[in-house]
Amino acid sequence: HENFLGSYYERFSEIAQQNPHAWNQKVFTAEEIKTPSEKNQRIAYPYNKLHNSSWNVNQASALILCSEELADKLNVPTSKRVYPLVSSETNHMIAVAQRPHLTRPAGLYLATDFLLESAGSHQIKPSIFELYSCFPVAVQLFAEALNLPDATDKTITGGMPFAGGPLNNYMLHATAQMLESIRNKPSEIGLITGVSGLMTKQALAIWGKEPLMDFQSKDVTSEASRIDIPVAMSANNDGEGTVLGCTTLFEHNEAVKSIFYVEDSQGERKVLTSTDKDIFKNLGEQEWV
């Protein structure tokens, strides 16, 4: 998995090098990305600094969203106009430990299905993508929901670690650059994704050079809340359980604490922690989930 993530983000780095707006245009190899170092410190296994968003950046972006009537009055050239075609979102929030499926949020799939089905009914197929990249799992979950092959580029900017991820404003940056890309190549159909918090909320949008369909949008929160019902937390202090997810937190490249999400025999959840050095070592060498 570390090798996979290294190669995945090496490609992001290569794309950032070609982005004149990118914060960091240096190309990092897969080996540099996956290997902890003084400048690429491990944050939480298996993620290092270069896997995560660079939010301490000085960047700004803007776009003008208006009606065609106003655009005509302002004499905005048709060559500069790009149209939102369809969007979807979910705001159903559940604590990570209580999610029925840690890596398969119902809201994400409902929102994705609506987006692709709405576009598909008008023979609209996305050709370029900007998947939110605060950390690799965000990219991977969206790619899986969208059924994108590994070989398909997941970013046009270079992603948040390299292009820059200005805190909660990256979606505006991604959209502005997507519109630039579509202006430069009008045949492209762009798809952008976003998240909030710990993969808590998800949103998607498709843009095109021409108004190929009447704009559609849907909030699937209510539907998602009926499917993803929070799992109860366990009050048991001992017993057996199944590990659903785990990581080890690091400070200055030294392991400090392992964290486990566990489901007990009653189907309830528990969050466990350990500072045992043998567990630190074992968790990095064997699959616990």
Located regions from the model:
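A conserved active-site cap/scaffold subdomain adjacent to cofactor or substrate pockets
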Residues: L167-M171
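Active-site core segments that coordinate phosphate-bearing ligands/cofactors
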Residues: S187
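Conserved "HGTGT" condensation-loop signature of ketosynthase/thiolase-family condensing enzymes
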Residues: H1-V57, S61-L63, E68-L70, V76-F162, ...
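Cysteine-clustered segments with highest specificity for TGF-beta superfamily mature ligands
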Residues: G190-I192
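Oxidoreductase and adenylate-handling cofactor-binding alpha/beta cores
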Residues: Q177-R183
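Active-site glycine-rich loop that binds ribose-phosphate moieties when present
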Residues: A174
